[in-house]
């Protein structure tokens, strides 16, 4: 809209000078060039992302931290899912990993994409996805539908997604699902399963009393000098997961490994506030 009105503004300037000047195009052209230069000068620093590699680093490090043929369940569209789809399909990066967007499971077209890209996973989900898609159809057509039935089928399907795949594929769940939907009881794990903090994600395990190893935090995420909401989100998310992993290591008396994760936070994510009690445990 602003660009639309700017064009009319430029035309108005040209028309004014055309009737009062012998060289009607010189001054308006100079004003337009000056306006462009000022816009570039005042906005370039803020909008220039040519040296920002945070999203690539975060996405690749997260996916690389998972085991082969793993399933990653998330709805971090801006930070993880859409970049991962790009790197998988354009750069052939870790195409073995199945990345499923929790929110896109609410859309019928997404199941065609899952069936095309991951027929094994989508096929096992069919007994639960087909009733959901049938209940979803009137909603997508703006017809009368049952929101209670739709939500019940949706929640059941998410739980079955874990249950029917966790024995054949490593299954990882992103922290936003744990902190939100699982905390509110909108998404539950199959009976007998629990979560262990891994490096960037939570891993679904059958016996949480047995120690589950994770990779060393030897990844690198390049953070830009100028922070915005997106960069801060990644910084806080990674910091929180590393702290959770450190606390998990402490639970099994792996003090040195716990220190390793905390030192990673202090060194590379200094803005993240480590819990005071955890800091004191090492002092």
Where are these regions (language model features)?
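ER/secretory pathway lumenal C-terminal domains and tails of membrane proteins involved
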Residues: 2-71, 75, 79-283
């Amino acid at each position: 809209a602003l660009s639309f009105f700017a064009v009319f503004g430029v035309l108005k300037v040209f028309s004014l000078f055309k009737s009062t000047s012998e060289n009607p195009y010189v001054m308006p052209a100079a004003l337009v060039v000056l306006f462009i230069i000022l816009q570039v000068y005042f906005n370039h620093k803020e909008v220039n992302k040519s040296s920002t590699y945070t999203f690539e680093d975060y996405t690749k490090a997260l996916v690389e931290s998972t085991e082969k043929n793993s399933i990653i369940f998330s709805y971090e569209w801006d930070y993880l899912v859409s970049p991962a789809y790009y790197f998988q399909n354009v750069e052939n990066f870790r195409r073995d990993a199945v990345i499923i967007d929790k929110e896109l499971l609410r859309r019928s077209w997404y199941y065609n994409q899952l069936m095309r890209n991951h027929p094994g996973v989508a096929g096992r989900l069919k007994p639960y996805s087909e009733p959901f898609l049938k209940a979803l159809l009137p909603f997508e057509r703006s017809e009368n539908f049952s929101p209670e039935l739709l939500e019940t089928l949706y929640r059941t399907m998410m739980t079955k997604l874990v249950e029917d795949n966790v024995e054949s594929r490593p299954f990882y769940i992103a922290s936003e699902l744990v902190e939100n939907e699982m905390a509110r009881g909108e998404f539950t794990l199959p009976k007998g399963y629990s979560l262990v903090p891994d490096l960037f994600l939570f891993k679904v395990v059958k016996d949480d009393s047995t120690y589950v190893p994770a990779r060393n935090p030897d990844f690198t995420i390049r953070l830009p000098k100028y922070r915005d909401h997106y960069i801060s989100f990644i910084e806080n998310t990674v910091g929180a997961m590393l702290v959770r992993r450190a606390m998990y290591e402490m639970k099994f008396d792996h003090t040195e490994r716990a220190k390793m994760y905390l030192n990673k936070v202090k060194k590379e994510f200094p803005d993240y506030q480590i819990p005071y009690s955890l800091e004191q445990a090492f002092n």
